[in-house]
Design a protein with these regions (language model features):
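Long alpha-helical scaffolds in large eukaryotic adaptor/regulatory proteins
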Residues: 14, 18, 72-75, 93, ...
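Well-ordered alpha-helical segments within folded domains of soluble proteins
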Residues: 59-66, 112-119, 164-168, 226
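Short acidic alpha-helix initiation/capping motifs at coil-to-helix transition points
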Residues: 58-60, 109-113, 345-350
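Alpha-helix C-terminal capping segments
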Residues: 66-72, 119-127, 278
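Hydrophobic alpha-helical hairpins/lids featuring a short glycine-rich hinge
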Residues: 45-100
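Glycine-rich, mobile lid/loop segments that gate access to catalytic sites or pores
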Residues: 77, 85-163, 181-188
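Terminal-appendage/accessory-domain detector
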Residues: 1-54, 155-165, 172-392
C-alpha cells in the first residue's frame, strides 16, 4: 500500500503540472505519454522527498517503472515491486553523498539514474550481473548541476526525466549484454572521486527505504516547509502576527533566503514568501506562488526575516526543522507534515490530489479515477489510459 500512495502522489503532481509551460514543451517534443509525464512530476515542487538523501524519488521512479511494465506487459504488482526497489537504490546511493556534493549537484539527478535502473531491472528480471552493469553505467553518465537554480529555466524538470529515461535505457541495454563498471562508485576515477569529498557508508536498514520518504503538502521547496508548518500552527492558535522571524538550518537559508522573488520558481524557493502566504490566510497551493501572488504579498513578505539556528543545522538532514517567532509567541517543529514523524493522513493526500486535479484544469471526477487506479488497480492499462487523457 505504501508504494500505491506514492504512485497516487506522483499522479497528483503530474495532474497539477499539465497546464504549465513545461507541459507544452512535453506535448510538442515527446510523442510518448510516459516521457511527457516524466517531465511533469517535479514541476510544482510538490513531489515526494527523502530528507537524508536530499532527493525526490517519485518523479524519477514512476516513469521508469511504468515504462518497463508497459514494455513487459506486466501487472500492477510487478510495477509496484519494481518501484519499491527503485526507491531503495536511489535513496541508498543518495545518502552516501556529502555536503560538498549537494553544494554543486542536484541529487535527484545524480542519484536518480540508479533508481531508474533498479526499477526497470527488477521488472525486466535482470540477474545480479546485468543489474550491476546497468548501475555502473548509471554512475558513469550521471550529472546535474545546480546552476539552473540561478536562472528562470526548466532544467530541473528535465533532470528528473533524464534520470528516469536513462535508467530505463541502461537496464534495457544491460539485458542485451552491454557491460558496465561495477566499481563505478568507489573505484579509481569513479563517481565518489569526481563528485564527493567524504562519501558516507551506505546504510540499508530492516525496512524498505520508501517508508522513510516524506510527502509534500505545499507547493514550495521542501526547505521552506517547516517554516510553513510553524506558521500554520501559530495561525490556528490566533498568534501569527507580522512581523515574524524564522529560524532554521543553514541549507534552508542557502537555498530559500529570497526576500525579493521575481519568478514563480523564486517564490517557491523563498521562505519569506512562503510564510507571507500563510500570514495572508492562503493555503500555500500552486496559485500562491504565481506572479500575481508575488506582487500581492510584497508588503507582508518584507515583514518576514530569516536566520540560521545551530540547533536545526546540527540535526539536518535527518530533520528539516524550523521556528517561527511572532511577538511573544513562537512555534518550533523538528519535523513537518508529511514526514514519517508527522505522517500524511489519507485525507491530506486526497485533498492534495483534488486540489492539483483542479489546478491542472481537469474535472473533479479525474481525482476519483486516479484514486481508484492508484490504490486498487491490478493492471497498468487504465493508468496509461488516464495519462493519455490528461496529457494528449
Amino acid at each position: 500500500m505504501r508504494a500505491r500512495l506514492h504512485l497516487l502522489d506522483w499522479l497528483a503532481c503530474v495532474a497539477g503540472a499539465r497546464a504549465t509551460p513545461v507541459a507544452a514543451v512535453a506535448r510538442t517534443a515527446e510523442p510518448d505519454i510516459l516521457t511527457r509525464a516524466a517531465l511533469l512530476g517535479n514541476v510544482l515542487e510538490m513531489d515526494d522527498v527523502h530528507r537524508a538523501a536530499l532527493l525526490h524519488p517519485g518523479p524519477v521512479i514512476w516513469p521508469s517503472a511504468l515504462s518497463a511494465a508497459r514494455q513487459e506487459k506486466c501487472g500492477m504488482d510487478t510495477a509496484l515491486d519494481g518501484a519499491v526497489r527503485g526507491y531503495e537504490a536511489m535513496i541508498a546511493v543518495g545518502t552516501t553523498f556529502d555536503a560538498h556534493h549537494y553544494a554543486h549537484f542536484h541529487p535527484t539527478s545524480t542519484a536518480g539514474g540508479f533508481g531508474g535502473v533498479a526499477a526497470a531491472a527488477s521488472i525486466f528480471a535482470l540477474d545480479t550481473e546485468a543489474t550491476g552493469w546497468a548501475l555502473g553505467n548509471a554512475a558513469s553518465v550521471t550529472g546535474g548541476l545546480w546552476r539552473m537554480r540561478h536562472e528562470d529555466v526548466m532544467t530541473k524538470a528535465m533532470h528528473a526525466a533524464r534520470a528516469a529515461l536513462e535508467g530505463l535505457w541502461l537496464a534495457r541495454l544491460a539485458r542485451a549484454g552491454l557491460t558496465g563498471p561495477v566499481q563505478a562508485l568507489e573505484g579509481e576515477q569513479g563517481l565518489y572521486a569526481a563528485m564527493v569529498e567524504h562519501p558516507k557508508a551506505m546504510e540499508l536498514g530492516p525496512d524498505w527505504l520508501i517508508h522513510a520518504v516524506s510527502f509534500k503538502p505545499w507547493a514550495a521547496c521542501r526547505h521552506a516547509h517547516a517554516a510553513i508548518d510553524c506558521a500554520i500552527e501559530l495561525q490556528a492558535a490566533g498568534k501569527l502576527n507580522l512581523p515574524v522571524a524564522v529560524e532554521t538550518y543553514a541549507d534552508a537559508i542557502r537555498f530559500c533566503d529570497r526576500p525579493h522573488p521575481v519568478t514563480e520558481l523564486d517564490a517557491k524557493f523563498s521562505i519569506q514568501h512562503a510564510v507571507a502566504v500563510i500570514a495572508d490566510g492562503r493555503k500555500a497551493g500552486p496559485e500562491d506562488f504565481t506572479a500575481q501572488a508575488i506582487a500581492a504579498l510584497a508588503d507582508k513578505r518584507a515583514q518576514v526575516s530569516v536566520r540560521e539556528a545551530e540547533e536545526f543545522t546540527r540535526v539536518y538532514p535527518a530533520h528539516f526543522g524550523a521556528r517561527v517567532i511572532s511577538g511573544t509567541a513562537e512555534m518550533t517543529l523538528a519535523d513537518t507534515r508529511g514526514d514519517p514523524e508527522r505522517p500524511a493522513s489519507p485525507e491530506m493526500l486526497g485533498a492534495k490530489l483534488r486540489s492539483l486535479v483542479q489546478w491542472g484544469g481537469l474535472k473533479p471526477v479525474e481525482a476519483d479515477r486516479a484514486h481508484e487506479i492508484a490504490l486498487h488497480g491490478t493492471s497498468i492499462g487504465p493508468l496509461l489510459a488516464l495519462l493519455e487523457d490528461w496529457l494528449a
